[in-house]
From Swiss-Prot:
Reaction it catalyzes: L-glutaminyl-[protein] + H2O = L-glutamyl-[protein] + NH4(+)
Record-level Gene Ontology MF annotations: protein-glutamine glutaminase activity
Biological process, per Gene Ontology: chemotaxis
The species this protein was found in: Rhizobium leguminosarum bv. trifolii (strain WSM2304)
Name of the gene: cheD
Name the UniProt record assigns to this protein: Probable chemoreceptor glutamine deamidase CheD
Origin: domain of life: Bacteria
Length: 184
């Protein structure tokens, strides 16, 4: 086995997932209110990680239609990716990270993300063997998909705010300005 410093690093960004069977690879991501699900089959020696922004699906009326932002889509992709590479559903185990409350608003998207991930895995019959969710600071996450080892580092307030800026949905484009005026 390679030393920790020599591990092949694969960074996961929002809306992505990766499945690997390389014992010398480590998956990493930076999380604010987003959640990362880390799943593996310990017998097959394969695992993966996803990184989603919002719970639910892109079919809801307020979603904006980008499926890669949503937990339902990325959870299904991760599970199916593991199964395609030889994992068995009955051997999968999960760890959940992220879901911080990084923006003080009325709704806590981070909490909703974490609750969604836990409920999704419960519904799928996949045990959650570890989790670290909530709080008010982001985290850097590392996950070794073959061994199942995970490590997180808390982010400072400034690092969390930079992460939040990356997670926020871009503003809708401005509506075109009317060139004519009608008086009544």
């Amino acid at each position: 086995m390679m030393t920790e410093g020599a591990a092949r690093r694969v960074h996961i960004i929002q809306g992505e997932y990766k499945v690997l069977s390389d014992p010398n690879a480590v998956l990493s991501t930076i999380l604010g209110s987003c959640v990362a699900a880390c799943l593996r089959d310990p017998v097959a020696g394969i695992g993966g990680m996803n990184h989603f922004l919002l719970p639910g699906s892109a079919t809801s009326p307020t979603s904006g239609g980008d499926a890669t932002r949503y937990g339902v889509h990325l959870m299904e992709l991760l599970i199916n990716g593991l199964l395609k590479q030889g994992a068995r559903r009955d051997r999968l185990e999960a760890k959940i990270f992220g879901g911080a409350k990084t923006i003080s608003t009325f709704s806590n998207v981070g909490e909703q993300n974490a609750a969604f991930a836990m409920q999704f895995l419960r519904d799928e019959g996949i045990p959650v063997v570890g989790s670290s969710t909530g709080g008010d600071h982001g985290r850097k996450l590392e996950f070794w998909p073959v061994s199942g080892r995970a490590r997180q580092y808390p982010l400072t307030g400034a690092e969390t705010q930079r992460t939040v800026a990356l997670e926020q949905r871009p503003a809708a484009p401005p509506k075109p300005v009317e060139t004519s005026i009608e008086f009544f």
